[in-house]
Amino acid sequence: KIYNSAKMTLEEVLEVMFEAEEKGRTTVRLHTGDPSLYGAIREQMDVLEEKKIPFDYCPGVSSFCGAASALNLEYTLPDVSQSVIITRMAGRTPVPEKESIESFAAHRVVFLSTGMLEELSRRLIEGGYQADTPAAIVYKATWEDEKTFVCTVGTLAETARKNQITKTALMIIGDVVSHSHYNRSELYNPAFTTEFREATK
């Protein structure tokens, strides 16, 4: 039997699991993307652990990984970026002040903020980004109707409006989007010794 959890409360979801457990059935609680990111799974696991109902937690492919694939980019380019911040704008679920958009000035992936792009641009610029910083909007990453739009921090909202993107998208911010300048990784450099091979130059 298939249930659409989008129309269910946490209690209703858990009740389905409890009933299945009593009948010796297996329940698959399927999340989009990777459940560890904005998946609201901790509250489910806590109850299952309390009830001593065993479960397996299987990782998925997050849309930020799918978005990188869609844009043919690497988030961690030598001498460009070695860090990625996964964040979101505050909505009904607040964001801790120390994790606000303005407090981070790095390469980042922004979830759940497609309807607030003008504010996102403003706050990124207030936080130290230039308006011409490379950016991208990826709509429905890894889906059949996936769409990608390369723009800048200053044109995020305009790009979304022009292409009628209002939800189900994430934004990638930083020079990794343009991947126009970076140094080669030392990992595969013939002059670099690793645990598995000696340098040859």
Residue ranges and their predicted role:
Residues 7, 32-35, 61-62, 91, ...:
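Short, ordered loop/turn segments at secondary-structure junctions
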Residues 1-2, 74, 108:
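Short, well-ordered beta-strand core segments
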Residues 34-105, 147-150:
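Class I SAM-dependent methyltransferase SAM-binding "motif I" and its flanking Rossmann-like core
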Residues 1-58, 157, 169:
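Class I S-adenosyl-L-methionine
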Residues 12, 22-27, 83, 92-201:
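A contiguous loop/helix-start segment that scaffolds small-molecule binding in enzyme catalytic cores
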